[in-house]
């Protein structure tokens, strides 16, 4: 799930309101939902970036990508 700028703005708005005057029960639930969606999006983006990394030994020029990562890349069609 990708998070939109509007959702990030709403997260920030709820955080400011919580500090200033507190949140209703519905707003607390909305805040928790939006925060979880934001964290899930960040984790998915990070995982996607890590899964595309290829590690090369500087001295030998050999591919030293960990086997576990190579397997994930094969599964996703990024390796032979």
UniProtKB/Swiss-Prot annotation:
Which Gene Ontology terms of cellular component type are present?
cytoplasm
Keywords, alphabetical: Cytoplasm
Is this entry keyworded Cytoplasm? yes
Return the InterPro entries for the record: DUF896 (IPR009242)
**Which residue windows are coiled coil?**
none
Its recorded name reads UPF0291 protein LACR_1198
- Write out the similarity annotation: Belongs to the UPF0291 family.
Q: Which Pfam families match?
A: DUF896
Q: Where in the cell is it found?
A: Cytoplasm
Tell me what organism the protein belongs to.
Lactococcus lactis subsp. cremoris (strain SK11)
């Amino acid at each position: 799930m990708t998070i939109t700028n509007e959702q990030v703005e709403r997260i920030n708005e709820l955080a400011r309101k919580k500090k200033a005057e507190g949140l209703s029960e519905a707003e607390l639930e909305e805040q928790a939902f939006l925060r979880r969606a934001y964290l899930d999006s960040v984790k998915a983006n990070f995982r996607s970036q890590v899964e595309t990394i290829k590690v090369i030994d500087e001295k030998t020029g050999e591919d030293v990508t960990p086997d576990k990562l190579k397997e994930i890349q094969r599964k996703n069609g990024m390796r032979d």
